[in-house]
Amino acid sequence: MSPNISLDNTYITLPEEFYTEQLPSKVPSPKLVKWNSTLAKELGLDSDFFQSEEGALVLSGNQILEDTTPIAEAYAGHQFGYFTMLGDGRAVLLGEIVTNDEERYDIQLKGSGRTPYSRGGDGKATLGPMLREYIISEGMKGLGIPSTRSLAVLTTGETILRETALPGAILVRVAKSHIRVGTFQFANQFLDTKELKALADYTIKRHYKEIFTKEDRYRHFLHEVVKNQARLIAQWQLVGFIHGVMNTDNMVISGETIDYGPCAFMDTYHPETVFSSIDTEGRYAYQNQPKMASWDLARLAEALVPLLNDNTEKAIEIAQEEINQFSKLYLTFWYEGMRKKLGLFHENDMDEDLIEALLGLMVKYEADYTNTFRDLTLNQTTQPNLKGSAEYQQWLDLWQDRRKKQEESLEDSIKLMESVNPTVIPRNHRVEEALERAVNYHDYNAMDSLVSVLQHPYDYKNQNDYYATPPGKTACGYRTFCGT
């Protein structure tokens, strides 16, 4: 049986300092446990082949396709504010696939063994975190948020030592690219301007080709990246997503969400919510995500200074001007999104106060973030704390008055709300239930059911209360771990 697949690799046209040719480590008995047939179809892949034993050999990296050059990418980054040399320490890029509509995607194996960038790690991954990334990334796709995708998860037949012995696994990740802010930091810190320019030109041609011929293309490039990240972070905030580890190596230039280690979705609304066990100071808490994205982008701007203008002072001024746009862009995207969540079509002077008042009540009465907007969409109040609140009723009256002043009908307002207020999200306790069944009992039914529901989060005709129910009080204090 033949895979009938051709992988390109344009990344190796960059100077050799940006990567190392690296074969994945062979594993004893690769077994496919999760296959994303929908994504496979989008990529034009033969599901029959890849679900076969031979297909598992290819997906695990045990068998390398002809005429391909697997690589590990070099990059640096600020991790919790501290700069360090990094790189793909447990991942190998098999190559790039070009779809029928001329879209180019990286095919990367995560958990594929040691590389020159492993820094003492074993280069391996375990089953739970890889399945978790599969669930969350597909959940983000369903929510309409730009994200890397998960094509497959395989067990390797290995036992990996972490706090305990765990089953080894490999995730097959699909991304528009894996070029990170940290890739530009690496070029600026360790290479010459010539190599930095080569990286910038390659990235522009791959992701922002419409600006390549423009004068001041590097300024235009920085502007587009800032705008895309402002939009992305607004989308995160609007659904209560907390990434957990917004280091510069986890911000990709394409504008996709990447690296789902310690991420989680907020249940009870509170701006200071943080889930990651390693984020002890709350650096990447929910309310800090816009600020930290701006900080990361400032590091990109610093790296691009040699390209922005021959005069360093002028280049720094340009960089600062573009970074200063982030806050305005973010707030524009966020307020636009919040108005939609409230069924409001057009901007009004009272909207900011209306939105802030609702969020304040949600904090005061410990309301569930997702279900508050779900209830508003359904014209109901299911949360006990809000149900008996005179303050909340007063807010509802103000909101209804605001909606009635629109030219658009109430029916159109409800349709708008249904299109942006999910009935379900990847609730942390439901994700953990699915992972426990899969990892401990080899039972993937709960995971399959969860992923199926998450693919249609805005389906108000077929709501599933089981997946919409917040955790009980005993599930509070949820903590996430990066799984590295």
UniProtKB/Swiss-Prot annotation:
Keywords: ATP-binding, Magnesium, Manganese, Metal-binding, Nucleotide-binding, Nucleotidyltransferase, Transferase. It holds the Pfam family SelO. GO terms for molecular function: AMPylase activity; ATP binding; magnesium ion binding. It catalyses: L-seryl-[protein] + ATP = 3-O-(5'-adenylyl)-L-seryl-[protein] + diphosphate; L-threonyl-[protein] + ATP = 3-O-(5'-adenylyl)-L-threonyl-[protein] + diphosphate; L-tyrosyl-[protein] + ATP = O-(5'-adenylyl)-L-tyrosyl-[protein] + diphosphate; L-histidyl-[protein] + UTP = N(tele)-(5'-uridylyl)-L-histidyl-[protein] + diphosphate. Mg(2+) binds at residues 250, 259. The active site is at 249 (proton acceptor). Its cofactor is Mg(2+); Mn(2+). Its EC number is 2.7.7.-, 2.7.7.108. InterPro entries: SelO. ATP binds at residues 87, 89-90, 110, 122-123, 173, 180, 259. Nucleotidyltransferase involved in the post-translational modification of proteins. It can catalyze the addition of adenosine monophosphate (AMP) or uridine monophosphate (UMP) to a protein, resulting in modifications known as AMPylation and UMPylation. Belongs to the SELO family. This is Protein nucleotidyltransferase YdiU.
